Swiss-Prot record:
Keyword Ribosomal protein: no
Organism: Staphylococcus aureus (strain MRSA252)
Class in the EC hierarchy, top level: transferase
Assembly with partners or alone: Homodimer.
Cofactor note: Binds 1 thiamine pyrophosphate per subunit.
Reactions that this protein is recorded to catalyse: isochorismate + 2-oxoglutarate + H(+) = 5-enolpyruvoyl-6-hydroxy-2-succinyl-cyclohex-3-ene-1-carboxylate + CO2
Listed EC numbers: 2.2.1.9
Pathway: Quinol/quinone metabolism; 1,4-dihydroxy-2-naphthoate biosynthesis; 1,4-dihydroxy-2-naphthoate from chorismate: step 2/7; Quinol/quinone metabolism; menaquinone biosynthesis
GO biological process, one term: menaquinone biosynthetic process
Gene3D superfamilies attached to this UniProt entry: 3.40.50.970, TPP-binding domain (3.40.50.1220)
Name this polypeptide is given: 2-succinyl-5-enolpyruvyl-6-hydroxy-3-cyclohexene-1-carboxylate synthase
Family note: Belongs to the TPP enzyme family. MenD subfamily.
Length: 557
């Protein structure tokens, strides 16, 4: 028995120390019995912060938020059985978003698998479709090989924590009773750092010269995931190229004349210019209309992504590069005789008129876009905006016009689950305001527990149209009118003031935009600001904006 305890202690303390060595500073633990050895190891490590969350689904998304806020890998730990399955949505989001989430599932020893033992399901390869790397660790014994397995596997897995290969990894760790390590053996807990991998690639610019010497080019920038963007702006300035900047690109914070923000509304309203080439940078953009245009244009498309598994959506490019945006555009710097001034000025002219129409519209609007416009005005440069999927991210895409604020969202799998938890995880490291709809909020209300337990301050702006507002813009609204409200509108009739009381948030309700204009977003007290809106009115007012922009494009071109 003594040998077992010593072997278990050495295994879990070494594992915790190796995670620290590769950059882990935070672990989110969902309590359970089988995870006792590792939970105690993390708790005993002097330089690892532990967070306790009883709901595994919410805990995993909270960790995703910690990663977004700290730009470091974060681990999650749970007990054996169905607890692990609750991690799946956040792992799927992490895989598509290239987020280094380290998934640690405790398991029954091998002799208790597939024999009907309690809390024992097949956990080996259970996230196979969503993780970049996975390994079923050996059971603790007193052999050197068991400890070597930790060193070897962590070294292999570390390539997925940084650089172009980032993504979630999964270690399944079986533990045999008794489960308590020797907490006095703290000399086994180390805080040494490993040399982290560095990735950089160059390109042969001459291979693209015949394309880039054409006149009508565009740079389209999606989610940059913390990459530097200064060379994009430099290249655009030198070579007179418009930049269509997604709100997650962080380029809209720059007051740069080449940054185009209104493109979604412009394409939605009929804009269709002939283009010779497109340089697509980063993740796919939010705008459905821009993605539809990319699918049908005959422009030569270049894709630049700093990861090994490129996201070709919405259409496979003609050529792609696995390289950082800054390295790519730095490699292209050369003399050129192409004069693009008139091409750039055409885009700048349309952008200027588009912004004017949007501002005029917002001065009179009373729909959700008016609330979103006011929120953007109220958000300071010190705050980050975390935007829920569905309608909120689309309104921000349309209405955020060059303001120095950082915008974040879960745009990997684009789900509405885990939004509150992700934003709260970010709020540990940044001042965050969350913009979210009522159904997304309902989906993750239990995530608010982390704010209550850990005094994490965050403001929540809740757009409440009592249902799924985005479905009003889809064909089923007209083709399935008899069933629309029940199947798609899905009203809940919930009073979220009770949610605020349950989790000790302040609560303020606004029935119109005028009331919200006079409100102040507090920075010291966590508050839910509920904005009451109407789905049908919201749809009708958006159509008015589209029509105004359509008329502007017709008159301008």
């Amino acid at each position: 028995m003594g040998n077992h305890k010593a072997a278990l202690t050495k295994q879990v303390f070494t594992f915790a120390s190796e995670l620290y060595a590769y950059g882990v500073r935070e672990v989110v633990i969902s309590p359970g019995s089988r995870s006792t050895p590792l939970a105690l190891a993390f708790e005993a490590h002097p330089n690892i912060k532990t967070w306790i969350h009883p709901d595994e689904r919410s805990a995993a998304f909270f960790a995703v938020g910690l990663i977004k806020g700290s730009e470091r890998p974060v681990a999650i730990l749970c007990t054996s059985g169905t607890a692990a399955a609750n991690y799946t949505p956040a792992i799927a989001e992490s895989q598509i978003s290239r987020i280094p989430l380290i998934v640690l599932t405790s398991d029954r020893p091998h002799e208790l698998r597939s024999v009907g033992a309690p809390q024992a399901i097949n956990q080996v390869n259970m996230f196979n479709n969503y993780v970049s790397y996975e390994f079923d660790m050996p059971i603790a014994d007193d052999s050197k090989e068991t400890i070597d397995a930790i060193y070897y596997q962590m070294q292999i897995a570390s390539q997925y924590l940084y650089g172009p290969h980032k993504g979630p990894i999964h270690f399944n760790l079986p533990f045999r009773d008794p489960l308590t390590p020797d907490l006095n053996a703290t000399e086994l807990l180390t805080s040494e750092m490993k040399i982290l991998p560095h990735y950089q690639k160059s390109i042969d610019a001459s291979a693209l010269r015949h394309i880039l010497n054409k006149k009508k080019g565009l740079i389209i920038v999606g989610d940059m995931q913390h990459q530097e963007v200064d060379q994009i702006l430099t290249y655009s300035t030198i070579y007179d190229l418009p930049i269509l900047a997604d709100p997650l690109s962080h380029l809209r914070k720059f007051d740069h004349p080449n940054v185009i923000c209104t493109y979604d509304l412009l394409f939605r309203s009929g804009l269709d210019l002939k283009v010779d080439f497109v340089i697509r940078v980063g993740k796919p953009v939010i705008s459905k209309k821009l993605n539809q245009w990319l699918k049908k244009t005959d422009a030569f498309q270049i894709l630049v992504q700093n990861n090994d598994k490129i996201d070709v959506f919405p259409i496979a490019p003609d050529i792609s590069y696995e390289i950082s945006a800054n390295d790519f555009f730095r490699s292209l710097m050369e003399d050129t005789t192409v004069n693009r001034v008139s091409w750039l000025e055409k885009w700048q002219r349309i952008e200027k008129k588009g912004r004017k129409e949007i501002k005029c519209y917002l001065e009179q609007a009373t729909d959700e876009s008016a609330f979103v416009g006011e929120l953007i005005k109220k958000t300071s440069e010190k705050d980050a905006l975390f935007i829920s999927n569905s309608m909120p991210i689309r309104d921000v895409d349309n209405l955020l016009l060059n303001k120095n604020i950082d915008v974040y969202a879960n745009r990997g799998a684009n789900g509405i689950d885990g939004i509150v938890s992700t934003a709260l995880g970010m709020a540990v490291h940044k001042r965050v305001t969350l913009l979210i709809g009522d159904l997304s909020f309902y989906h993750d209300m239990n995530g608010l527990l982390m704010s209550k337990l850990n005094n994490i301050q965050m403001n929540i702006v809740l757009l409440n149209n009592d249902g799924g507002g985005i479905f009003s813009y889809l064909p089923q609204k007209e083709s399935a009118t008899d069933y629309f409200e029940r199947l798609f509108g899905t009203p809940t009739g919930l009073d979220f003031e009770y949610t605020a009381k349950l989790y000790q948030f302040d609560f303020k309700r606004f029935n119109n935009v005028s009331e919200f204009k006079n409100a102040t977003l507090l920075s010291e007290t966590s508050t839910i600001y509920e904005l009451i809106t109407n789905r049908e009115d919201n749809f009708k007012q958006h159509q008015i904006l589209y029509q105004k922009l359509s008329e502007m494009i017709h008159d301008t071109l």
